[in-house]
């Protein structure tokens, strides 16, 4: 089927930024793997301790390969490009590269596995993206392929002649994906707690976490790295440990998380009271509009729906602020 796609300068800028991000990621990988044991070639049989994070990024890559293959079979080049874009930017660069910084401080077997995963997944990504962005992938592949053990340093080879990635279901680890999904949700929740408490992202804070101890211990270094935490402390009973604190608590699966923050009760009461008054005003405005029969009957359905959503959002926020006010100790 013929599809007309309008040229969009903003989208072109976005893909330029994507290529820049791919270049930065490649520099990071090479800086950490060149001249070091990556578990390829002569050291391929040396022990490597792959973490659930390594297994997760490999699983995500395989999922992307499957998605890209389906897109090509359906003659949807746009879907193929979007799948590659999403994996490289959202999974590899935003998550795995950052998480790998934790593992590169681990044991030699952990470091070797992380270096191996960093470079082999990147090399495979360059092969996957080559038909869509041939020039930059060829340039980067020439630098990455030797370290990845794909070619020898004195061997002339071109990316366009390499085997294209194919989906391998055996490399998909559902358990690793599930564990990583929990870690991502925990990190997102901690960031939301920061935002809710108006804490700057640069300010490192201690975290209290309750839940299965082994899982919390495994997650702790990753939470500390990506959520910019001063420390992560496991407690059996968060409610008891946080007694007297007014900090909000996030619940993710079996775990509860709370930033340990010393709060000026008087200032916090004043701030929350102002916010509650503002939200109450917004709720009243929405209720007034929706209670007006002329507005409901004459306004477009989309406008009425938007107003209903605003009312629901403001009502939920007001309830949350009032809950925080109730938690404040008496002065």
PLM features: residue spans?
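Feature 926 captures the class I aminoacyl-tRNA synthetase adenylation module centered on the KMSKS loop
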Residues: 3-331
């Amino acid at each position: 089927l013929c599809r007309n796609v309008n040229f969009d300068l903003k989208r072109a800028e976005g893909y330029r930024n994507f290529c820049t991000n791919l270049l930065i990621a490649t520099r990071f990988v090479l800086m950490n793997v060149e001249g070091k044991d990556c578990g390829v070639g002569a050291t391929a049989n040396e022990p490597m301790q792959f973490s659930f994070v390594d297994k997760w990024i490999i699983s995500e890559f395989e999922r992307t390969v499957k998605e890209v293959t389906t897109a090509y079979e359906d003659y949807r080049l746009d879907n193929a490009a979007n799948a590659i874009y999403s994996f490289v930017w959202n999974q590899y660069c935003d998550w795995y590269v950052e998480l790998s910084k934790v593992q590169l401080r681990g044991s030699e077997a952990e470091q070797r596995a992380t270096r191996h995963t960093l470079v082999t997944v990147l090399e495979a990504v360059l092969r996957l993206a080559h038909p869509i962005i041939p020039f930059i992938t060829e340039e980067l592949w020439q630098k990455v392929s030797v370290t990845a053990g794909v070619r020898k340093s004195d061997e002339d080879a071109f990316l366009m002649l390499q085997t294209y990635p194919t989906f391998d279901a055996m490399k998909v680890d559902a358990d690793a994906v599930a564990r990583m999904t929990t870690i991502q949700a925990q990190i997102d929740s901690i960031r939301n707690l920061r935002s809710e408490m108006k804490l700057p992202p640069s300010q490192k804070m201690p975290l209290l976490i309750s839940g299965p101890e082994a899982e919390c211990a495994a997650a702790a270094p990753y939470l500390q790295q990506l959520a910019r935490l001063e420390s992560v402390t496991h407690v059996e009973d968060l409610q008891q440990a946080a007694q007297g604190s007014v900090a909000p608590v996030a619940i993710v699966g079996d775990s509860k998380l709370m930033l340990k923050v010393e709060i000026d009760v008087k200032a916090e009461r004043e701030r929350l009271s102002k916010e509650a008054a503002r939200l109450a005003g917004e709720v009243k405005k929405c209720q007034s509009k929706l209670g007006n029969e002329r507005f409901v009957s004459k306004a477009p359905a989309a406008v009425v729906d938007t107003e209903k959503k605003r009312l629901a959002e403001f009502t939920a926020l007001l309830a949350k602020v009032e809950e925080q006010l109730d938690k404040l100790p008496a002065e």
